[in-house]
């Protein structure tokens, strides 16, 4: 994705070989990720941004409450309505070689080089996430209350996901038909 042109206001703090820039950025959430049958976002969202320059590395922290964003999904646990706050943090440790750590109360995701990493919905897979190799593909962990097979396997999206390494699902109620 691309960061659109922004009108920036904020502050600059310089101390001991470190430069910290603080500002706000506005994003059209629909432009950040391609919509799929499983996930889409819509809304104009403001992020508090901190750019940190230290030891020749530029990192970026973004924080928002996603109040102006609607998240649609075939998975009920991932959906979010407009005007519902969901504090979300995004951290990019090195803008010259970006990886993305995204965290909120609903999910946690790490997207590394070549789109390797993980997506975890719910909090029941912390141990398994610590044991995976983030460089060998993309791992999906889903903790769901109720699950219909049709919700996830309704088309060939996963056949086209060449780096999908594993999918682990914990389900309270499974509806096969």
Question: Across the structure, where does each feature detected by a protein language model lie?
Answer:
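Membrane-proximal interfacial segments on either side of biological membranes
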Residues: 1-105, 111-177
């Amino acid at each position: 994705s691309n960061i659109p042109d922004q009108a920036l206001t904020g502050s600059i703090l310089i101390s001991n070989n470190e430069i910290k820039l603080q500002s706000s950025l506005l994003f059209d959430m629909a432009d950040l990720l391609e919509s799929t049958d499983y996930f889409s976002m819509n809304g104009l969202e403001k992020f508090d941004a901190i750019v940190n320059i230290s030891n020749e590395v530029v990192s970026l922290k973004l924080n928002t409450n996603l109040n102006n964003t609607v998240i649609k999904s075939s998975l009920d646990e991932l959906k979010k309505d407009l005007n519902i706050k969901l504090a979300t943090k995004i951290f990019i440790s090195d803008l010259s070689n970006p990886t993305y750590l995204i965290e909120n109360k609903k999910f946690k995701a790490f997207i590394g080089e070549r789109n390797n990493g993980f997506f975890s919905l719910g909090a029941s897979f912390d141990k398994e996430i610590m044991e995976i190799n983030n460089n060998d593909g993309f791992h999906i962990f889903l903790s769901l209350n109720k699950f219909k097979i049709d919700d996830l396997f309704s088309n060939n999206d996963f056949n086209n996901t060449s780096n999908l390494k594993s999918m682990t699902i914990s389900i309270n109620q499974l509806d096969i038909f």
